[in-house]
């Protein structure tokens, strides 16, 4: 039985839910209905105040950064917004000296391809990427093998908190412990965790936690974000600072003085409209509380998983909800055909080659929608 059904009162806040059976928040969270009004606020300030709008825009970008940071337990002033995670990964790479004896990044073959592409290039800087294969089932990381790969040559350890293909919720604690034993930094990619799994970056003990807003946060494109632990931020010196990454951007001083803390990662002119667009969804999640979101998510994904198994479908996600994020990956057979037919029938899900169809009931979805998508899969396979 689903819990926190009172959250369904928020369905009108997400217009796409009235137009389709939307079960794809793992790939693009539903837009909040207040987003157009917030964007109108942004354009009104520009139209009425011109350059003076920066007096409102700049603090608003920082406020929104603090709101999204709070959703992963980050203290105020420790999170920065940028356009994408790719930008932020590049900045982190530029902060590190890859020319010494400590020149390795340890990561997993199950990471997001964009991240693996970045790590594959550190050899150009004198570094080495150690890519540890996942477990043979392709569902989970091989944590023991990753821990064994971390040694005094390791500069950085990077892994996802929730794996994008299979929704595996990774226990990062052994990686953090081992990395810090040998003096390495730890960066966790929380893109598939934030907004659906309770996260406390301080308790995790990570040095950097990176993510974006396209998925369960429902913040839309253009809102990558980075938390940097205060004890390491002053030692990190990104090559690309832009004018917002310096101590006094409006002094226009040609001599570089890094901004304190995480602000040095702010880069150039911020994506003000993206921050305005994301704010309503962030604020809604802050009001609800991620713990309640998680409880509702599990109350929907567990019946989804169990019913899929009962129908004879292959499930490529952990069966234990404590080890799973917000989506379930299902291969009913003929996955590409089933996926395409689901879309034709008004179900929005997505397909990942080699694993199956990803389905993610978020807090705004109903138990009936979960049952309906499985019934539709069965109907497609039966030729109905």
Question: Where on the chain are the PLM-derived regions?
Answer:
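Pyridoxal 5′-phosphate
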Residues: 1-384
């Amino acid at each position: 039985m689903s819990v926190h059904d009172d959250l369904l009162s928020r369905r009108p806040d997400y217009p796409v839910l009235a137009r389709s059976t939307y079960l794809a928040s793992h790939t693009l969270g539903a837009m909040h209905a207040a987003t157009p009004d917030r964007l109108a606020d942004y354009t009104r300030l520009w139209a009425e105040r011109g350059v003076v709008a920066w007096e409102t825009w700049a603090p608003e970008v920082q406020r929104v950064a603090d709101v999204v940071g709070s959703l992963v337990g980050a203290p105020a002033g420790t999170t920065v917004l940028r356009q994408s995670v790719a930008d932020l990964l590049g900045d982190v790479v530029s902060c590190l000296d890859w020319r010494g004896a400590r020149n390795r990044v340890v990561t997993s073959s199950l990471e997001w391809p964009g991240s693996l592409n970045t790590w594959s290039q550190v050899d150009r800087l004198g570094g080495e990427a150690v890519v540890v294969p996942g477990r043979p089932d392709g569902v989970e990381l091989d944590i023991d093998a990753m821990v064994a790969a971390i040694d005094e040559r390791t500069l950085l350890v990077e892994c996802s908190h929730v794996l994008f293909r299979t929704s595996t919720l990774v226990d990062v604690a052994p990686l953090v412990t081992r990395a810090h034993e040998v003096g390495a930094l730890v960066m966790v990619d929380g893109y598939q965790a934030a907004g659906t799994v309770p996260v406390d970056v301080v308790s995790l003990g990570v040095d950097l936690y990176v993510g974006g807003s396209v998925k369960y946060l429902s913040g839309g494109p253009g809102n990558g974000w980075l938390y940097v632990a205060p004890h390491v931020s002053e030692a990190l010196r990104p090559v690309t600072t832009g004018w917002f990454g310096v101590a006094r951007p409006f002094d226009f001083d040609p001599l570089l003085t890094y901004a304190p803390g995480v602000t040095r990662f702010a880069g150039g002119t911020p994506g003000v409209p993206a921050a305005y667009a994301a704010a309503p969804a962030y604020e809604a999640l802050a009001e609800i509380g991620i713990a309640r979101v998680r409880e509702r998510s599990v109350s929907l994904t567990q019946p989804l998983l169990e019913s899929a198994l009962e129908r004879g479908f292959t499930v490529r996600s952990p069966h234990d909800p404590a080890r799973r994020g917000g989506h379930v990956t299902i291969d009913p057979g003929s996955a590409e055909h089933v996926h395409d037919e689901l879309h034709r029938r008004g179900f929005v899900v997505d397909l990942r080659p080699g694993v199956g169809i990803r389905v993610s009931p978020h807090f705004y979805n109903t138990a009936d929608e979960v049952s309906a998508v499985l019934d539709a899969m069965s109907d497609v396979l039966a030729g109905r």
